[in-house]
């Protein structure tokens, strides 16, 4: 044990970067705004139920875009609705994130071919950070997507664009079984 180690242990000094502190604060207080449009909204509501307890991840749902930093688009986005989605997105403060939940918001879903009124993916009007596939995706998949957003926030650095951070995140693999295993353990303890 050196002189520096003794000084740190005696005076409770914390050594970290500003990036780590800012990212920890942002990922520990993620405030999503749900934009439930179809079947996926039911699964999104189930995810907010007490048996999944999103608050343990620091996720507190908000109903105002001015208080949220994550928009969850869950369901079919029509052409008439596109302008409203853009307006809500622009009202969100920076840094803001978008999670696209379900086949309809990802690529148009079953309406992509013959639905002239359906937008063929919400990413055509606003930038999407994380996609959650499924029709509708289970709550565990949505929790996995929320954890991906938190991982994206954790990897952000001052001076590095979000596109570079997304590229790094895509290089990592994500196992949705981890969420299921964690849930089973927490239910066994209860």
Curated annotation (Swiss-Prot):
It comes from the Bacteria. It catalyses: a quinone + NADH + 5 H(+)(in) = a quinol + NAD(+) + 4 H(+)(out). It is a peripheral membrane protein. GO terms for molecular function: 4 iron, 4 sulfur cluster binding; iron ion binding; NADH dehydrogenase (ubiquinone) activity; NADH:ubiquinone reductase (non-electrogenic) activity; quinone binding. GO terms for biological process: aerobic respiration; electron transport coupled proton transport. Its EC number is 7.1.1.-. One of its GO terms (cellular component) is plasma membrane. Its main location: membrane. Keywords: 4Fe-4S, Cell inner membrane, Cell membrane, Iron, Iron-sulfur, Membrane, Metal-binding, NAD, Quinone, Translocase, Transport. Pfam families: Oxidored_q6 (PF01058). Its cofactor is [4Fe-4S] cluster. [4Fe-4S] cluster binds at residues 39-40, 104, 135. NDH-1 is composed of 14 different subunits. Subunits NuoB, C, D, E, F, and G constitute the peripheral sector of the complex. NDH-1 shuttles electrons from NADH, via FMN and iron-sulfur (Fe-S) centers, to quinones in the respiratory chain. The immediate electron acceptor for the enzyme in this species is believed to be a menaquinone. Couples the redox reaction to proton translocation (for every two electrons transferred, four hydrogen ions are translocated across the cytoplasmic membrane), and thus conserves the redox energy in a proton gradient. Belongs to the complex I 20 kDa subunit family. This is NADH-quinone oxidoreductase subunit B. The gene is nuoB.
């Amino acid at each position: 044990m050196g002189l520096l180690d003794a000084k740190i242990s005696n005076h409770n000094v914390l050594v970290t970067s500003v990036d780590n502190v800012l990212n920890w604060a942002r990922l520990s207080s993620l405030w999503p705004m749900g934009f439930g449009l179809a079947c996926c909204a039911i699964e999104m509501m189930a995810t907010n139920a007490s048996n999944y307890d999103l608050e343990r991840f620091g996720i507190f749902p908000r109903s105002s875009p001015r208080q949220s930093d994550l928009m969850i688009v869950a369901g079919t986005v029509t052409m008439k609705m596109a302008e409203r989605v853009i307006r809500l997105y622009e009202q969100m403060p920076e840094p803001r994130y978008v999670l696209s939940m379900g086949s309809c918001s990802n690529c148009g879903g079953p309406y992509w071919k013959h639905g002239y009124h359906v937008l063929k993916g919400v990413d055509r009007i606003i930038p999407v950070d994380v996609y959650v596939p499924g029709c509708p995706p289970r709550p565990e998949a949505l929790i996995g997507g929320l954890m991906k957003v938190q991982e994206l926030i954790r990897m952000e650095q001052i001076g590095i664009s979000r596109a570079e951070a997304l590229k790094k995140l895509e290089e990592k693999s994500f196992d949705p079984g981890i969420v299921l295993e964690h849930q089973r353990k927490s239910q066994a303890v209860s």
